[in-house]
Amino acid sequence: INKAKQLAQGVVANTLELELMENIGYRNTPIQITDNQILENLKRVQFANDIPESTQLERPKGLNLGYNLTIEMETGTGKTYTYIRSMFELNKEFGWSKFIIIVPSIAIREGVYKSFEVTQDHFQEIYQHKITPFIYNSSRPQDIENFASDSRISVMIINTQAFNATGKDARRIKMELD
């Protein structure tokens, strides 16, 4: 866990990333296509949908693992459905099973969780399995352990305020636990 903290803070060299990720639980399989191919695919989709083309791929700050994929759509146009379906497709195509959704408010967090509940049967018919979503709660560290160790498609839904919370049970996401 300390290595994970140091890596997140940029203290440890990025060469430890893969080794570290394999030692702390399930992780998504690296994509077997190049960054240039991913960027070209992204540009093709953006062009087809009259969206300004990206000039580069975005990654989490300080890491060379994964991509920051942002879905920006007007309210009520199917954003949540789109990213839930994208999770199933990423699982089908690449075996990805870990996703984190960060939302700006508690109300949106609850709405996203509800969307997983109400679309569960629909996606079960299409993909023959379900996603296991949970809402991050600092007083329930076992949920994070389950998320990391479960081989099924798992989604952690967290609101940005959880990163700034204070108190005895707050910020457990950054703490070393038993």
Question: Which residues are covered by each model-predicted region?
Answer:
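RecA-like P-loop NTPase motor core of helicase/translocase proteins
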Residues: 1-178
